[in-house]
A protein has these predicted regions:
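N-terminal secretory signal peptides
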Residues: 1-21, 33-41
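Beta-strand-rich domains and repeat architectures in extracellular enzymes and scaffolds
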Residues: 71-100
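Structural signature of eukaryotic scaffold interfaces centered on beta-propeller domains
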Residues: 76-87, 132-140, 185-197, 243-247, ...
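Beta-propeller domains
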Residues: 92-123
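Blade-loop segments of beta-propeller domains
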Residues: 116-141
Length: 336
């Protein structure tokens, strides 16, 4: 497979020109509606001691670039998340399974090439909403990480690791799954993998609130859960949560809603960066990536490193009409 191509996205604008987030775009976390402002945000109790080496972060006000637009997934519903295997140069996109109830936890994973052409698919039954997935290369194989064991809120309660197997259908009780419960008492959890540094961010919910924990991927895969590198509160008041990614010492979040009468173009999509050692919101910027798309719902984030060594922060957007939703990926590549 060829490497990711570089096609400029022309409609990115700095945050200074962006509209303020709408009241409709506020985020419900912990049962409370929190008023949003760009930096007047609330956090829970203090996080773990800093253990993730500090490094560069992506500039979120730089314009975005296209990878592809209007890619057709195996099923017809909106994408929820995506992930890259940067060793074997593979891309996987998650969506809810067509024909299944929204609360079933049934997912479809589509493998695409970097031009958006379909290469394969898997079905996962009883897993979750597909909020975030991760890919772990093992030689020439790819192992996927997803949420599993769907709850009454249509979210997974544990993590599952399994080998990508084109055309297969796995139930939540399949022997092909290795299940993990790294956070005791968590009622929801998903993960995102930093493929450059081989670390994993786990976004989880307990009775005390929602948080991010950062671990080494190898530790979680081995069932070693008592070595978190950091653990910080999840920021509130940023808008409707739509995905996250981990790179270095920062978690990146995507928020916003699809276009509609209450959210016309240019929409209310924002990208933010959070220091995983302190929980501090470092930057928040409005994004117009893919602003000309129809529907344009922000859906998913990911990290990729090209063969030449350039690291990219990807943003996903769903487009199209009901019954024919499409996948669209854009990226930022300026580190500061």
């Amino acid at each position: 497979m060829s490497d990711l191509r570089d096609v400029p996205e022309r409609d990115g604008v700095p945050a200074a020109t962006a509209p303020s987030p709408s009241r409709r775009g506020l985020l419900r976390l912990g049962g409370g509606l929190v008023a949003a402002s760009a930096f007047g945000l609330s956090f829970g109790a203090g996080g773990a001691a800093a253990a993730v080496p500090a490094g560069k972060r992506f500039s979120l006000t730089e314009p975005s670039h296209d990878l592809f637009r209007h890619a057709k997934l195996h099923d017809a519903r909106v994408q929820q998340s995506f992930t890259f295997d940067i060793v074997n140069r593979r891309l996987f996109v998650a969506q809810l399974k067509s024909g299944s109830p929204d609360d079933s936890g049934d997912l479809c994973i589509t493998q695409l090439d970097f031009s958006g052409n379909k290469l394969g698919h898997m079905y996962l039954l009883g897993f979750g909403h597909g909020v975030s997935i991760g890919a772990q290369p093992v030689g020439a194989d790819t192992y996927l990480w997803t949420e599993v064991d769907v709850n009454s809120n249509a979210r997974g309660t544990r993590l599952a690791r399994f080998k990508w197997n084109n055309g297969a259908t796995l139930s939540r009780t399949s022997s092909a799954l290795a299940k993990h419960q790294p956070i005791p008492g968590a009622t929801e959890m998903t993960c995102a993998i930093d493929p450059v540094n081989n670390r994993m961010a786990i976004r989880y919910l307990t009775a005390s609130g929602r948080r991010y924990g950062v671990y080494n991927v190898a530790d979680i895969a081995a069932g070693v859960y008592d070595k978190p590198l950091s653990d910080v509160p999840h920021p509130t008041g940023l808008g409707t949560f739509q995905g996250y990614a981990l790179y270095g010492s920062y978690v990146y979040q995507l928020t916003g809603n699809p276009y509609g009468p209450d959210n016309p173009n240019p929409g209310n999509s924002y990208v933010s960066s959070v220091d995983v050692n302190t929980g501090a919101l470092v930057q928040r910027a409005f994004t117009r990536a893919g602003s000309t798309l129809t529907f344009r719902e922000p859906e998913g984030m990911g990290i990729y490193r090209t063969a030449a060594g350039e690291v990219r922060l990807f943003l996903g957007f769903a487009s199209g009409v009901a019954g024919d939703r499409r996948s669209n990926l854009f990226y930022k590549n300026v580190l500061i």
